[in-house]
A protein has these predicted regions:
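Short hydrophobic/Thr-rich beta-strand motif most characteristic of the beta2 strand and flanking loop
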Residues: 26-33, 41
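The feature encodes the CheY-like receiver
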Residues: 15, 57, 66, 75, ...
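C-terminal output helix
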Residues: 107-117
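Active-site beta3 strand of CheY-like receiver
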Residues: 45-51, 56
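Charged docking surfaces used in two-component/phosphorelay signaling
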Residues: 16-24
Length: 122
């Protein structure tokens, strides 16, 4: 059974590129374009991993990460923060909220795929 990944980004082109890259590698992808839908999909779908933008309509990525990581039912789900927020303070905030990895845009798809595989133990 393929691993399920929730991709959350409000940029449709970027979200589609990430989705195609991961599906090509055999992952099942579900998507959300805003913070509230992301939290809802994470709770209902229980993905194996989440790729999460920081700047989102509704709830931002840091709030979503914090809510999931401090909930016993979801804290085991690895979260990759994928964002244009590239300053050191942003990366530290990502770590503080519980993100497992912080990757800045623009990024190389092969690097993202390698990190996904690493976090999923593949």
């Amino acid at each position: 059974m393929s691993k399920k990944i929730l991709i959350v980004d409000d940029e449709p082109d970027l979200l589609e590129m990430v989705q195609i890259s991961l599906e090509t590698e055999g992952y099942e992808c579900i998507v959300a374009y805003d913070g509230f839908r992301a939290l809802d999909r994470a709770r209902k779908e229980k993905p194996d991993l989440i790729i999460l933008d920081v700047m989102l309509p509704g709830l931002n990525g840091h709030k979503i990460c914090r809510l999931l990581k401090f909930d016993e039912q979801y804290k085991h789900i690895p979260i990759i923060m994928l964002t244009a927020e590239a300053q050191e303070k942003d990366r530290l905030l990502g770590e503080e909220t519980g993100a497992d990895y912080y990757m800045t845009k623009p990024f190389a798809a092969d690097k993202l795929i390698a990190k996904v595989a690493e976090l999923l133990g593949k």
